[in-house]
């Protein structure tokens, strides 16, 4: 028996919106401590890892560890039927091939339930090794989204360079080049407006902007984003979900040989 009740139902809607364009079908793994999802995108370039801890739910019951395969597009369609203030309950029975989403209005004068068919999905659980990162940048998530959007109008890739002076986002395209530098800035009224850089060694890596822009769909989940980088490791773009968990996106860097020759 599985039953989870989330008072802030809009949170689940935002989580789905942030990952559904990257991942089509995925297994949600439920345990007594919370539920998680880990899946590669369809082109096997990016990895999504989601965790929502049980203590963030008003009611959380999971009698035994269970995995439910869901189509995220279909799940998103169902969650869109919930009002932003609705309380969302997820129910599942052992051995059932469906999951039920129940939406209650805050005044409880309207209750809707939607039943969705589950899928059998073969997916290997990829061990994500813990790593020490050379550079970790914490910055306002809206600023990161704006930078990725602006640079994508110029080029296809972004070079993220971290030095003790700051973090630089650069791109080049047919019409020219663009460089945006953020200096460390901790003297702000609100902590979420700060740009904080922890750096052991300078790092400079290149990534596809198409993916970075997709990751920024998680911006509504958190005021801040944390970008962790080390040479030869995928970048980690993390959005913390208040008191509950996180959505993390892992993206392999583009290697030098991926780049076209200048003038080619």
From Swiss-Prot:
It is found in: Nucleus. GO terms for molecular function: DNA binding; DNA polymerase processivity factor activity. Its main location: nucleus. InterPro entries: DNA_clamp_sf (IPR046938), Pr_cel_nuc_antig (IPR000730), Pr_cel_nuc_antig_C (IPR022649), Pr_cel_nuc_antig_CS (IPR022659), Pr_cel_nuc_antig_N (IPR022648). GO terms for cellular component: PCNA complex. GO terms for biological process: leading strand elongation; mismatch repair; regulation of DNA replication; translesion synthesis. SUPFAM superfamilies: DNA clamp. Disulfide bonds: none annotated. It comes from the Eukaryota. The keyword Plastid does not apply. Residues 61-80 bind DNA. The keyword NADP does not apply. NCBIfam families: pcna. This protein is an auxiliary protein of DNA polymerase delta and is involved in the control of eukaryotic DNA replication by increasing the polymerase's processibility during elongation of the leading strand. Belongs to the PCNA family. This is Proliferating cell nuclear antigen. It comes from Populus nigra. The gene is PCNA.
């Amino acid at each position: 028996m599985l039953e989870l009740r989330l008072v802030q139902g809009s949170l689940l809607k935002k989580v789905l919106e942030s990952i559904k364009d990257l991942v089509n079908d995925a297994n949600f793994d439920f345990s007594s401590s919370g539920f998680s999802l880990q899946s590669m995108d369809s082109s096997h370039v990016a990895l999504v890892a989601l965790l929502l801890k049980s203590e963030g739910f008003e009611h959380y019951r999971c009698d035994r560890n269970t995995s439910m395969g869901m189509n995220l597009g279909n799940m998103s369609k169902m969650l869109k039927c919930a009002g932003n203030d609705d309380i969302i309950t997820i129910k599942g029975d052992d051995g059932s091939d469906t999951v039920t989403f129940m939406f209650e209005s805050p005044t409880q004068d309207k209750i809707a339930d939607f039943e969705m068919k589950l899928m059998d999905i073969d997916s290997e659980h990829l061990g994500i090794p813990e790593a020490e990162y050379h550079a970790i940048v914490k910055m306002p998530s809206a600023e990161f989204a704006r930078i990725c959007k602006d640079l994508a109008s110029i080029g296809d890739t972004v070079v993220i360079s971290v030095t003790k002076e700051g973090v630089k986002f650069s791109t080049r395209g047919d019409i020219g080049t663009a460089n945006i530098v953020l200096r460390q800035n901790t003297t702000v009224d609100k902590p979420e407006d700060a740009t904080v850089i922890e750096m052991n060694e300078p790092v400079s890596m290149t990534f596809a902007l198409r993916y970075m822009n997709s990751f920024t769909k998680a911006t509504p989940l958190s005021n801040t984003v944390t970008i962790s980088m080390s040479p030869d490791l995928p970048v980690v773009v993390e959005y913390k979900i208040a008191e509950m968990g996180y959505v993390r996106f892992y993206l392999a860097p583009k290697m030098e040989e991926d780049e076209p020759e200048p003038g080619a």
